[in-house]
Each structure stands twice: as C-alpha cells, then as structure tokens.
A protein has these predicted regions:
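Short glycine/proline- and charge-enriched loop/turn segments
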Residues: 33, 75, 191-201
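Active-site beta-alpha loop architecture of Rossmann-like, nucleotide-cofactor-dependent enzymes
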Residues: 65, 184, 236
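Short alpha-helix
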Residues: 235-247
Length: 272
C-alpha cells in the first residue's frame, strides 16, 4: 500500500495539489497537518479505494464540496449535495450587510427567499438570536438539506416550500426580506463551469433579472413599513437592480454594497 505522502502526490498528477491533500484528509478523517506528521504511514486498502474514487470524481469535474458533502460558510460546516448551490464567500457580504441593519437587542422578522442550503437564513439566526427567521425554496430536496443544516447547527427556522411569495401565508409581514436568487445571465460563459450545480438556482434562463424584478414587485405586500429588501447579484448587475427598484417607485434608500473584491454584490432598498 502507498504511504500518505505517495498517495496525495500520485493524485496531484490528476488534480490540484491542495485538493488532493484535502480529499485525502477527509478520507482519513484527519486534518491536513496530520498528512505532514504522518506522511510515511501506509494507507489501508479501504481508504485507498475510497480516495481513488474521490480523486476520479474530482478529475471529472465534480466540485470538491459535493465530494466531501460539506462546505464551510461563515465559519460553520454546511451539508451540501447537488440539490443545492455550494455556499460561496461572496455571499457573506449580504449576511454582514443584513446583520448590520439589525440591532442585537431588537426582535425583527426575516425572510430568506430561495434558501438553498440555508446558509444565509441559518447564519443570520445564529449570529443574532433575536431574529425570527423564515426561509423558502421551491425545491423540496433543497429544503431537506436546509432543514438538516438548521438542525445540525442548532438554528430555529421555519421553512416554507413554494415559488417565491406563493410559499408564504398572506398574513405574514417581515421587517427584512433577503434573497440570493438565480441571477446569472443565460449566456454567461461561466455557466459551463457550473454544470454540477442545480441550473435553476443559477439562472432564470434569461437576463438574470427576472426573479429579482418579480420579488421587487411583490415584496411590498409582505414587508412592514420601512422594511428592508436586499439581494445578492452579479458583479455587473448593481445598476440594473437599482433601476428595477426605481421602476417600481415604492422604494427609498436604494444602495449597492461591494464585496471584499470591490465588486457590486448586494443591492438593497427600504419600503417607503
């Protein structure tokens, strides 16, 4: 049997060196530091076979988080499967923005629309225990993952299944509505690199603004006065989203927030 060092070095001929180590550490159930301190240890046959399978999947293009079954977001491990998008660091921008709008001692109601893995809703609930968080998704499979993550991480969230506001009882009103909707343009060249993720969570099949426009149009019926509506969007969509808010005329305090890379990432407004 090959040693720890030999195994990841052989794998790095097929996949990225860092990913080769990450996958091996996962197969062994250890940290990457362990790979250094135990580099001469021989692998068992079962671990080697499992590792080879993981490497083969990665070599075919399967994203590492889907192979591992998890992805870290805001310092917490979230279960992921191909039923949900892989949480990305850029999405922490909208979480931080919303948290900044919520005084720690204020009890506010929050709705996360299109929750996917639940990373936004769960993080908001855990970072501010005074928030009453609801979340929706049109996909039952995605909601199952989100509910599992909420249970595993200890977040108290009520989930609704359905398409956007159709999922929400008409009687509910929120202080904040947040969404990371499918916003990628159907002709965006990056879509071809995201083939393993659910296409319906990536793009609306048009210009990427269809769902954003729909939510802006219908959100006033589900927001309290002065309520906040915030979207994550593409780096080049800030101006377009601001224009959509202005088109519907019921909004004030329209603003766009940049991510750590200096790109437009979140646009928000308050109900007038």
């Amino acid at each position: 049997m090959p040693t720890v060092s030999e195994a990841w070095q052989n794998a790095s001929k097929l996949i990225d060196r860092f990913e080769a180590k990450l996958l091996l550490a996962s197969c062994l159930g250890v940290t990457r530091t362990y790979l250094i301190t135990h580099d001469k240890d021989a692998l068992t046959e079962s671990v080697l076979n499992h590792y080879k399978k993981c490497v083969q999947e990665r070599a075919k293009g399967v994203p590492v988080p889907y192979i591992l079954g998890k992805q870290e977001f805001y310092g917490r491990p979230f279960k992921v499967t191909p039923a949900v998008l892989i949480p990305r660091p850029d999405t922490e921008t909208i979480v931080e923005f919303v948290l900044a709008q919520c005084p720690i001692d204020s009890e506010l109601s929050v709705l996360d629309m299109g929750t996917g893995s639940g990373c936004i809703a769960i993080t908001l609930a855990l970072e501010n225990s005074n928030l009453n968080v609801n979340a929706t998704d049109v996909s039952p499979a995605a909601l199952e993952i989100a509910e599992t993550n909420a249970k595993n991480l200890g977040a108290d969230i009520h989930f609704y299944c359905g398409s956007w506001f159709e999922a929400i009882p008409d009687s509910l009103r929120y202080d904040i509505i947040v969404s990371n909707p499918p916003y990628i343009h159907r002709e965006d060249e990056h879509l071809k690199n995201l083939g393993y993720e659910p296409i319906g969570a990536l793009t609306d099949g048009f210009d990427g603004l269809t769902h954003i426009d729909h939510i802006i149009k219908n959100a006033p019926s589900f927001l309290k006065k002065n309520g906040l509506l915030a979207f994550e969007h593409g780096w080049d969509q800030g101006e377009s989203v601001r224009t959509l808010f202005k088109k519907h005329s019921l909004w004030k305090d329209i603003q766009t927030i940049q991510d750590l890379g200096g790109n437009d990432r979140v646009t928000a407004a308050r109900l007038a």
